[in-house]
Regions:
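N-terminal extracellular/periplasmic Venus flytrap/periplasmic-binding protein-like
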Residues: 14-15, 25-34, 43, 178-269, ...
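Conserved catalytic cysteine-centered active-site region
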Residues: 58-112, 155-161, 225-251, 332-359, ...
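Flexible glycine-/small-residue-enriched beta->alpha junction loops
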Residues: 112-168
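Active-site-proximal alpha-helical scaffold in enzymes
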Residues: 87-119, 169-198, 258-265, 330, ...
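Active-site pocket-lining segment
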Residues: 163-166, 202-204, 279-348
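Conserved active-site "lid/cap" helical segment
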Residues: 2-64, 68-72, 76, 80-83, ...
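Condensing-enzyme catalytic core mediating Claisen C-C bond formation in acyl metabolism
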Residues: 1-30, 39, 228-293, 297, ...
Length: 395
């Protein structure tokens, strides 16, 4: 990244995260995306006419109609001149949009960009693969779009991603007790953050139309339902004697997040006040089955590009697709627990897969501001053996 004229974050916004068939069940992914985009633009002080491009992550687009990112832009009230691209990099989609936007800005291709992600896992449809040519006789199979394209390995058929996480947890000799304790602490942090109002500067409320009138959703749904005392009693999720449970896995969720990006020189020229600069970003790829440890490689590469060490970073966000993902990063990189996911992670808050990359950047920036810190680094594991990471610094 050019430090002479760095890419900067002008604003951020995210919706609350709803549970599976929960508070946001009646809201399409594109409407969630539009809500986050509209709020991010309003908070940035940028005239919508200045926005040239929008990138939005969306992993489960079946049934949404053409060009989900374009729909989100138009529904948000952006000019029809805004170019839109929908990005699918599985769980890394929302972060990849920020990386792509940053690269476009650094290259001088555009001046103002929106980057984000959106997902309604609740509304992912079931698919009938044979009906194009006709099922003819007998029974057919309905494929769950959410599971097939979001939660199932593409290289070993019918294997849930959690089975690979369990294998790696076994290799690390992570105990059930350690993972339960991590999930309980993540839930405690999320519940405390909600009680203390820590998420208020991130969240834009979603209006849900119901038969009884509009309902305003302004709080993450799932932490309020969490019961720490129940976590140690849950059955293993992916192996008979396994150590990973539903509580130490991220929950199926709905939500969206968006950020407005530009270059420092443009912000200065137009009287806009940036919040943070993007210092570096990186990606890493390895064996698909080892996706849960891929953030270690991405974080190391990102630190090298930034010229930082682990000790230079004030706060980390490592997406808790499973609790063990953050625990692997803590183990391999020496990240202190009190520096990682300080307001709770996806095991407590939820993981709307196309949105989470943008969501954790949003939460990281807000946490740095709230706690008076300066440098942050966010990373996610990605199905297929990949990971991305991004380093930011408050201005």
């Amino acid at each position: 990244m050019s430090q002479a004229d760095p890419v900067v974050i002008l604003s951020y916004a995210r919706t609350p995260m709803g549970g599976m068939q929960g508070a946001l069940a009646d809201v399409a992914a594109t409407d969630l995306g539009a809500t986050a985009v509209r709020a991010a633009v309003e908070r940035s002080g940028v005239d919508g006419a200045m926005i040239e491009r929008i990138y939005m992550g969306c992993v489960l687009p079946a049934g949404l109609g053409q060009a989900p990112a374009r729909q989100a832009a138009i529904k948000a009230g952006l000019p029809k001149s805004v170019q839109a691209t929908t990005v699918n990099k599985v769980c890394g989609s929302g972060m990849q949009t920020v990386i792509m936007g940053s690269e476009a800005l650094a290259a001088g291709s555009v001046d103002y960009v929106i980057a984000g992600g959106m997902e309604s896992m609740t509304n992912a449809p079931y698919l009938l693969k044979k009906h194009r040519s006709g099922a003819r006789i007998g029974h057919d199979t309905a494929y769950d779009h959410m599971f097939l394209d979001g939660l199932e390995d593409a290289y070993e058929a019918r294997r849930a991603m959690g089975t690979f996480a369990q294998e790696t947890a076994n290799e690390y000799q992570l105990t059930r007790e350690a993972q339960d304790a991590y999930a309980i602490e993540s839930l405690r942090r999320a519940q405390s953050a909600i009680a203390d109002g820590a998420f208020k500067q991130e969240i834009v409320a979603v209006t849900v139309a119901t038969r009884k009138g509009d309902v305003i959703v302004d709080t993450d749904e799932q932490p309020g339902k969490g019961m720490p005392d129940k976590i140690p009693t849950l059955k293993p999720a992916f192996a008979k004697d396994g150590t990973i449970t539903a509580a130490t896995s991220s929950s199926i969720s709905d939500g969206a997040a968006a950020l407005v990006l530009t270059r420092q020189s443009l912000a200065d020229a137009n009287g806009q006040k940036p919040i943070a600069r993007i210092v570096a970003h990186a990606a890493h790829a390895q064996e698909p089955s080892a996706f849960t440890t891929a953030p270690v490689g991405a974080i190391n590469k990102c630190l090298e590009k930034a010229g930082w060490t682990i000790g230079d970073v004030d706060l980390f966000e490592v997406n808790e697709a499973f609790a063990c993902v953050a625990m692997f990063a803590m183990h391999d990189l020496g990240i202190p627990h009190d520096k990682i996911n300080v307001h709770g992670g996806a095991t407590a808050l939820g993981h709307p897969i196309g949105a989470s990359g943008a969501r954790i950047i949003t939460t990281l920036v807000a946490a740095l501001q709230r706690h008076g810190k300066n440098r942050g680094l966010a990373s996610l594991c990605i199905g297929g053996g990949e990971a991305t990471a991004i380093a930011i610094e408050l201005i």
